[in-house]
């Protein structure tokens, strides 16, 4: 009987959602389980979608103390990829993001607010094109748990809109902003 109670107790402890514990994670870019995507208007007629292929980062997450959560990301702006080599060369040029001069963009969170139902506001400082501005990312907790290889993972999605003029990036045509969509899966350190 005692063994049965202990076994049941251990099983219940293991069934408690993984995310209930505070943990530090590295963003899984090696396994391609994270992406930084963008969408920008093309002449007001359609949209160009793309991504940054090279980035790294980490985050801390505690479902019981959301305010203690933190995020740090570094993006190689030279890795911008819209699936069109000539356009990418132009976007990376001094006409837009000037990736030769400003080859990294960084985001460092300053505050994380719990909005309920797994939704979060992640506020922080984005440095892009040599300019640092506060932004807010509307994020959502996707899930957490053990992976098939014995590690622990946690995932989030997020969106934000960046006004190009805020970062001294020239506006061309009708689009004064770029929408960002973030998919983040972290592996527990």
Swiss-Prot record:
GO CC term, one of those recorded: periplasmic space
Record keywords: Periplasm, Signal
Main subcellular localisation: periplasm
Subcellular location: Periplasm
Keyword Lipid biosynthesis: no
Superkingdom, natural source: Bacteria
Signal peptide: 1-22
Matches recorded under InterPro entries: Lipid/polyisoprenoid-bd_YceI, TTHA0802/YceI-like_sf, UPF0312/YceI
Family indicated by similarity: Belongs to the UPF0312 family. Type 1 subfamily.
Cross-referenced HAMAP family: UPF0312
Name the UniProt record assigns to this protein: UPF0312 protein VVA0736
Organism: Vibrio vulnificus (strain YJ016)
